[in-house]
């Protein structure tokens, strides 16, 4: 088994190994890695006419037929009656672009000719423009005078209108302030009696379901110098008579006296 080349050189430097074995030469095989789109086998099997080849299109993944002499292509075989032989899409696009460029150049030339004719027509029109400018200037001066008068009249009208608006705004502001004061006041003096009349009746108040007069906030409260007779001072009307309630002792005495009279009888 031969030693590695690196080890042989190290041993040769030290004087241990005197004979160096030559490195084996590797055989380099050159291969063509270029993708040839022409399918020669399919061309031979289909029996295509001379100069026609079957080519694979890598962009769409489909084969087409190409004539090497005329550089025309077809999706179907030349033997097929439905085949349409035309130029490739790339060549058609380039030819269309060239035609558009030529058309644009012709349009540019015609536009330049029109510009030259327009310039020649513009020269005699300059004299007319000067006279028109003079007329325009006089018209402008006249219009400025009219505009000045109209502006002054409009200012006077706006001033009068603003005065009328200011007066109406002042009156409206006074009315708003007056209403606001009346709303903010807790007990307005002028509306005390009206507010009392407008208050709704309490359904538990006797005056809401009988002829009893409507009471005030102090009705039913005890008075300082009022004798405690036990009479219902709030009762009024034909069905309610003001009389004191009898005490329990008076009731017992009245019952005893009534029983005595029954026994005597």
UniProtKB/Swiss-Prot annotation:
Natural source organism: Pongo pygmaeus
Recorded GO MF terms: double-stranded DNA binding; ribonucleoprotein complex binding
Region of interest (Important for interaction with TXNL4A), residue spans: 245-255
Region (3 X 2 AA tandem repeats of [DE]-R): 139-144
Location of this chain's protein in the cell: Nucleus; Nucleus speckle; Cytoplasmic granule
Domain text: The WW domain may play a role as a transcriptional activator directly or via association with the transcription machinery. The WW domain mediates interaction with WBP11, ATN1, SF3B1 and the C-terminal domain of the RNA polymerase II large subunit.
UniProtKB keywords: Immunity, Innate immunity, mRNA processing, mRNA splicing, Nucleus, Phosphoprotein, Repeat, Transcription, Transcription regulation
Domain WW: 46-80
Protein name, per record: Polyglutamine-binding protein 1
Chief place of localization: nucleus
Stretches the record annotates as 7 X 2 AA tandem repeats of [DE]-R: 150-163
GO cellular component: cytoplasm; nuclear speck
UniProt record, GO biological process: activation of innate immune response; alternative mRNA splicing, via spliceosome; cellular response to exogenous dsRNA; defense response to virus; innate immune response; neuron projection development; positive regulation of defense response to virus by host; positive regulation of type I interferon production
Keyword Nucleus listed: yes
Origin organism lineage: Eukaryota, Metazoa, Chordata, Craniata, Vertebrata
Gene name for this UniProt entry: PQBP1
